[in-house]
């Protein structure tokens, strides 16, 4: 970092469920806060799968790392293993996705988020702007990521989509990187990052059409809601890979109260195990105290409550504390 001429911040990639992804990342984020307190810290976090578990103690690790990193992270883009598996199955016809398939898909999102730092465009967005436009309160910093269009190389020759079509696709449940239902929540902010053959006129028309849809609800205290980035560099794919080379694509980062569903699922699993104090002795044996579990769980309960509060209309008297 000291060799950088214009350090904007840090991108940290980790999983919630594993010991290294949760434990080491928590320590790393704490250190970065001390050494580089003024720099942005953005996370790309892999959320545990609802069906397939790689470790029995995933709920513990997930709650503990979220609690520890909450004050050190400026923005955390969550990616759900189950959602990515489903996209590979459905959109790319991959029956048994490998980590390579999954990572290439995540790579497209990371590429979109960082494209404006690396290439020219009509409307560029830097790391600080993500926070400014997506994070209304410090703790509410877990945007939902959606990407369109994801199609296989075989289908690409007869399926090039227009700007309105890829924009609409961003609001479809099937293109989300986390399993939750935005129709049950409210949007606080949306950041649409376009790449390739895209002009502002088409984007404005697409957004105007989106705003007329009843199913997309914004909180009443943030009525405008859309931040746009346009980058002329078309999406790049790995030669010979499963993803098609397309003329244009969009990555949507949206801060929605629906993401609280993901926390509720994790909290429930944590509660089932912690009620029996199952596996806790392994953590205590490594130097942790049992009280840290209760503290982390209480913090996550507060986070769920925070999301509930911001989703209320101003008229409901929902008063939110930072």
UniProtKB/Swiss-Prot annotation:
Documented EC number(s): 3.6.5.-
Keyword set includes Membrane: no
Catalysed reactions, as listed in the record: GTP + H2O = GDP + phosphate + H(+)
Catalytic residue list: 129
SUPFAM superfamilies: Tubulin C-terminal domain-like (SSF55307), Tubulin nucleotide-binding domain-like (SSF52490)
GO biological process: one example: microtubule cytoskeleton organization
Gene Ontology terms, MF aspect: GTP binding; hydrolase activity; structural constituent of cytoskeleton
Binding site for GTP: 15, 19-20, 54, 81, 103
Top EC class for this record: hydrolase
Changes after translation: Some glutamate residues at the C-terminus are polyglycylated, resulting in polyglycine chains on the gamma-carboxyl group. Glycylation is mainly limited to tubulin incorporated into axonemes (cilia and flagella) whereas glutamylation is prevalent in neuronal cells, centrioles, axonemes, and the mitotic spindle. Both modifications can coexist on the same protein on adjacent residues, and lowering polyglycylation levels increases polyglutamylation, and reciprocally. The precise function of polyglycylation is still unclear. Some glutamate residues at the C-terminus are polyglutamylated, resulting in polyglutamate chains on the gamma-carboxyl group. Polyglutamylation plays a key role in microtubule severing by spastin (SPAST). SPAST preferentially recognizes and acts on microtubules decorated with short polyglutamate tails: severing activity by SPAST increases as the number of glutamates per tubulin rises from one to eight, but decreases beyond this glutamylation threshold.
UniProt cofactor(s): Mg(2+)
Subcellular location field: Cytoplasm, Cytoskeleton
Gene3D superfamilies, A to Z: Helix hairpin bin (1.10.287.600), Tubulin/FtsZ, C-terminal domain (3.30.1330.20), Tubulin/FtsZ, GTPase domain (3.40.50.1440)
Function according to Swiss-Prot or TrEMBL: Tubulin is the major constituent of microtubules, a cylinder consisting of laterally associated linear protofilaments composed of alpha- and beta-tubulin heterodimers. Microtubules grow by the addition of GTP-tubulin dimers to the microtubule end, where a stabilizing cap forms. Below the cap, tubulin dimers are in GDP-bound state, owing to GTPase activity of alpha-tubulin.
Subunit structure: Dimer of alpha and beta chains. A typical microtubule is a hollow water-filled tube with an outer diameter of 25 nm and an inner diameter of 15 nM. Alpha-beta heterodimers associate head-to-tail to form protofilaments running lengthwise along the microtubule wall with the beta-tubulin subunit facing the microtubule plus end conferring a structural polarity. Microtubules usually have 13 protofilaments but different protofilament numbers can be found in some organisms and specialized cells.
Family: Belongs to the tubulin family.
Leftover remarks: This tubulin does not have a C-terminal tyrosine.
Protein name as it appears in the record: Tubulin alpha-3 chain
Species name: Gallus gallus (Chicken)
């Amino acid at each position: 970092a000291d060799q950088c001429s214009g350090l904007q911040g840090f991108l940290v990639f980790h999983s919630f469920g594993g010991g290294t992804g949760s434990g080491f990342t928590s320590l790393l984020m704490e250190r970065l806060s001390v050494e580089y307190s003024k720099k942005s810290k953005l996370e790309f976090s892999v959320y545990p799968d609802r069906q397939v578990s790689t470790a029995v103690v995933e709920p513990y690790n997930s709650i503990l790392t979220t609690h520890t990193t909450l004050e050190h992270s400026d923005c955390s883009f969550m990616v759900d293993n189950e959602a990515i598996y489903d996209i590979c199955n459905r959109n790319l016809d991959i029956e048994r996705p490998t980590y390579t398939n999954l990572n290439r898909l995540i790579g497209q999102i990371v590429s979109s988020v960082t494209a404006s730092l690396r290439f020219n465009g009509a409307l560029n967005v830097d790391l600080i702007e993500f926070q400014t436009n997506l994070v209304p309160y410090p703790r509410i910093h877990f945007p939902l990521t959606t990407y369109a269009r994801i199609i296989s190389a075989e289908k690409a020759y007869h399926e090039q989509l227009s700007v309105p079509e890829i924009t609409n696709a961003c609001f479809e449940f099937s293109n989300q990187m986390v399993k939750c239902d935005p129709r049950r929540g409210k949007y606080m902010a949306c950041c649409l990052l376009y790449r390739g053959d895209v002009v502002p006129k088409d984007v404005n028309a697409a957004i105007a059409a989106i705003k007329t849809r009843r199913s997309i609800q914004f909180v009443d205290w943030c009525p405008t809601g859309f931040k746009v980035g346009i980058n002329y560099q078309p999406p790049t794919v790995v030669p010979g890979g499963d993803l098609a080379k397309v003329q244009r694509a969009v990555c949507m980062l949206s801060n929605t109260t629906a993401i609280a569903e993901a926390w509720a699922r994790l909290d429930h699993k944590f509660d089932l195990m912690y009620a029996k104090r199952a596996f806790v002795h392994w953590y205590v044996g490594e130097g942790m105290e049992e009280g840290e579990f209760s503290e982390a769980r209480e913090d996550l309960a507060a986070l769920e409550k925070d999301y509930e509060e911001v989703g209320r209309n101003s008229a409901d008297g929902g008063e939110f504390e930072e």
